[in-house]
Amino acid sequence: MVDRRTFFRGAGLTAAAIFGTGLLGACSSAVDEQRAGAATGASGAPVRGGTLKTGIPADVIPATFLTNTSGATTVIGLAYDTLVRYPHDKVEPQPRLAKSWQLAADGLSLSLELRDDVTFHSGRPFTSKDAEFSLRTYADPKWTAQLRSTAAAITAFDSSDPHRLVLTLAHPLGNVFDLLDTVPILDSESIDKLAAGDAFIGTGPFKLVSRTPNSALVFERNEHYWIPDRPFLDRVEVSVIPDSQALLSSLKSGQVAVAGGLNYRDTETLGETAGFQAVSLEGAELQVYVGANVTHPALADVRVRQAIAYAIDRDRVISEVFRGSGYPVNLPWPKSSPAYDEARNTTFTRDATKARAILAGSGIAVPTLPLTYQAGNPFYEATAQIVQANLAEIGIPVELDPQEGATFIKALIGGTIPALWVTFHSWAQYVPSTLTISAYPFNALKNSSHYESPAYVDAAGAAWRVTDGTGAEAKDRYRAVSDQLLDGLFLVEIGVVLNQLAAAQRVQGIDWTKRSEIVYTDTYLA
């Protein structure tokens, strides 16, 4: 079993530092209020008003606002809108700020009809020039946005009509609607303040009214939101609580009513406890994996990476760390993906004997390898411990290397992690070409592993350049991509996992995007 000290280390001190002596005094009244609210909400009718208090493990990092990091997803979900939005269970765009569209038969242009009743939090009307600005900004390398390649394939914009935007594309883009689902509509007049972390002005259901870096964000209802009578809530207060046990204590005591970033065991327990609920973010799957820097002398040989792939106990990671909320895979695609392939997902199953034989056949004496992960995250640390034990079993010594969150993200983006790492990736729940064209770990042209392969570049490019990203032609091309991933093995997939929230039962109407941006537009306190 996973060492439970992983999940509790330092919790008491951190909780005391955050809550001080007021924690115990507030505990009983807050819990009583929570239970009373749950009973009142039995009718199921939405209730207007109230303040929702939530907890997240990390603050927004302005420089990585467009990279799908956890703090940014909180702000985007509350304060921003996109042109389209995918439903949870498929990649079929639904109207948001774009109310309709027409993709040319040759896939080389896309015309978007935009809403004319939308304003920014500043009061300025939203027009096609704002949509153009947002897409151009997303393509700017300084923001290191993961779908930048797709945004950069837009070669021309026609925003002459304030309520119509026409995009000219360099070639057919099977994932163009992934881009439109992802890019938040940004305010050109305050973009410098966004970069500094001083203002986050969007068109979303809530507007940011205050931010204390690494501590708290406060949002109030956007009274001029384009969806009538929404949002229901008056206010959302977000506390940044990096320690998972302090966050758990805060939820149990009623200091917050929604918490993201708890370990799966605690979320599972809360889901079985009166007054609480566990919310699985269906359609926003994450993948946990081991990455390898192939410029490391020992990891340059694919046979060493194959040995690692055979050594990892995927079933144990899914069952112990994620409490069965997921399933083992060899490839990144979730079961809902048009690229999912059951047969290819059994290529590497745990076989320590075979792993040792492959390692011996390589003739490489593998030195101690650092295994880097984001410190303070219980999923990563527990997974890293299992991987460390698995690799020790086949003769590969591993030293755990926890890094502070911003440092880890910078190293991942910059490709400076020295050997192995454990983290999540996303984007596989989208049109499959998005992953191999865009995501840092997978990008065929430049990735975090420094893996280079003309065959992989060709396969990824061919899968991208299709008009219909879910059609038969695309699926054939995705199989070629999957084969390249298994052959190169610069990333060793462990499993698909469902992101989860824990919440008080009285919090109803929680929604989310495919990027795990939590959406409180329809949320109310019962």
Where do the protein language model's features map onto the residues?
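Ligand-site clamp/hinge motif
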Residues: 224-269, 397
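Surface-exposed binding/hinge segments that line
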Residues: 113, 147-189, 210
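Extracytoplasmic/peripheral linker and loop segments enriched in polar/acidic and small residues
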Residues: 399-402, 406-408, 437-505, 526
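Long beta-strand-rich cores associated with HINT superfamily self-processing modules
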Residues: 501-526
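N-terminal lobe/hinge region of extracytoplasmic solute-binding protein
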Residues: 55-105, 136, 201-202
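Alpha-helical secondary-structure segments
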Residues: 53, 127-136, 162-168, 204-205, ...
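Structural transition elements
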Residues: 327-361, 377-380, 469
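Gly/Pro-rich hinge or "lid" segments in bacterial periplasmic/extracellular proteins
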Residues: 87-88, 173, 180-231, 235
